[in-house]
Curated annotation (Swiss-Prot):
Name used for this protein in its record: Beta-lactamase
Annotated source species: Streptomyces griseus
GO molecular function, one term: beta-lactamase activity
Note: The class A beta-lactamase family has a specific amino-acid numbering system, sometimes called Ambler or ABL numbering and often misspelt as Amber. A multiple sequence alignment was used to derive a consensus sequence and then the consensus was numbered taking into account insertions and deletions. This allows use of identical numbers, e.g. for active site residues, despite differences in protein length. UniProt always uses natural numbering of residues, hence there appear to be differences in numbering between this entry and some papers.
GO terms classed as biological process: response to antibiotic
Amino acid sequence: AAAPDIPIANVNA
């Protein structure tokens, strides 16, 4: 996911 800190375990690969 490209979203900032707030999402749970957002993986910006």
